């Protein structure tokens, strides 16, 4: 987190970047309504037997047409598809490059956000996921 805060200061982005913790539903909707880019990198904690799950926050952002920058860890590559609904990064240097590229290329940022929303609506909504699980359970029975 300190390295991210340092990059924010280095590029003088304090007025444009907010690192937020836990928020309620109304706060979340307000934040997403005023957000251009979801940045949620994850550390590899596999040695501690802690793996990032699917990443519901990426889908919540997608519902607001917000593309995401995510790490290639755990289930996040299933939530964010590289160069289609956002960008997948390997390390802090790629995070820096990904942020710059989506800030500088508004057209691509908007395209990724639109793709993310379409995917969230058509493939990742709760009704579709519940049906998939029900079908799987019926198949096993």
What function would you assign to each model-found segment?
Residues 22-23, 30-35:
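Short alpha-helical donor nucleotide-sugar binding micro-motif in glycosyltransferases
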Residues 26-27, 94:
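Short acidic active-site motifs
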Residues 33-51, 66:
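Acidic donor-binding loop of glycosyltransferase active sites
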């Amino acid at each position: 987190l300190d390295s991210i805060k340092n990059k924010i200061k280095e590029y003088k982005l304090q007025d444009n970047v907010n690192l937020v913790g836990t928020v309620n539903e109304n706060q979340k909707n307000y934040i997403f309504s005023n957000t251009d880019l979801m940045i949620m990198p994850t550390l590899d904690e596999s040695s501690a037997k802690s793996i990032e799950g699917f990443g519901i926050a990426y889908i919540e952002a997608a519902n607001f047409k917000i593309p995401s920058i995510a790490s290639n860890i755990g289930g996040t590559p299933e939530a964010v598809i590289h160069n289609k609904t956002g960008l997948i990064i390997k390390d802090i240097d790629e995070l820096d490059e990904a942020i710059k590229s989506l800030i500088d290329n508004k057209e691509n940022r908007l395209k990724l956000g639109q793709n993310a929303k379409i995917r969230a609506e058509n493939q990742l909504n709760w009704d579709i996921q519940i049906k998939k699980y029900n079908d799987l359970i019926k198949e096993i029975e």
